[in-house]
Every structure is written in C-alpha cells, then in structure tokens.
C-alpha cells in the first residue's frame, strides 16, 4: 500500500504522508508474542527507511506506536485481577481508548507535522518510561 501510494504521489509530483500503526511492543519485548514484536519492530524500521527514501519527494512517513488499548477483544481481560494489576503499573493508571489515537493521527496527517518524518509517536500512557 505504501509503495503504491508513494509511486502515485511521485508520478504526480504531489507531497503526501504515510502513517503506519506500529506498537510499543516493537520497542519493548514481552514473552509469548515473538512474531508480533518482530513484525512491529520491522514496521518501525520500515517507517524510518521509507522516511529517508521518500523525503526528497516531499512524502513524510511516520508511525504511531500504541500501548495497551481497550478493544472488544480484550475488554474482559482488563476486568480480571491480572488486567487490573497491569493497569496499576501503567503511569496514567488506565489503558488507552481508541479516541486517544485521534490527536496523534491528526497531527501526523496535518501540516502541523510538516517537519516530521521518520518519527514514531508512543501513545501508551507512559508505559515505555515506566519499569513495568
């Protein structure tokens, strides 16, 4: 998708922005999800590589790395004792809500980030700066 987008923008000499959705697990590993963490780490490096390659064409490439977010799939986990204990270890003492991704996404999609490329924005309630 990124390649097709970039080719189209380059052919038209139009600027653009690509926003990848990575994960904090691309920066910090945990047990039992090796394939997931490897794929997200790869996506972070792809973001940086594409940013370098596409900058001269005025195409910015950035990523958002969400932490733990409540979804329909995992909502019941966060109600368990293990889930509540994990939430207590997140500095903001809560998991993310999908609306928490709106601001960072709008930032990266707008001209407010015109001088950002190759960046990865962590949206994790402070998870990565804690000693979880």
Language model segments and positions:
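Active-site loop immediately N-terminal to the catalytic Tyr-X3-Lys motif
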Residues: 28-34, 56-57, 93, 111
């Amino acid at each position: 998708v990124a390649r097709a987008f970039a080719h189209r923008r380059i052919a038209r000499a139009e600027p653009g922005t690509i926003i990848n959705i990575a994960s904090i697990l691309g920066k910090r590993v945990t047990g039992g999800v090796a394939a997931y963490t490897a794929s997200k780490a790869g996506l972070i490096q792809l973001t940086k590589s594409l940013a370098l390659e596409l900058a001269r064409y005025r195409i910015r490439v950035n990523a958002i790395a969400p932490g733990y977010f409540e979804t329909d799939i995992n909502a019941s986990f966060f109600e368990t004792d293990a889930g509540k204990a994990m939430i207590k270890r997140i500095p903001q003492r809560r998991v993310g809500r999908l609306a928490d991704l709106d601001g960072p996404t709008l930032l990266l999609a707008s001209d407010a980030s015109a001088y950002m490329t190759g960046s990865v924005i962590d949206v994790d309630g402070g998870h990565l700066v804690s000693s979880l």
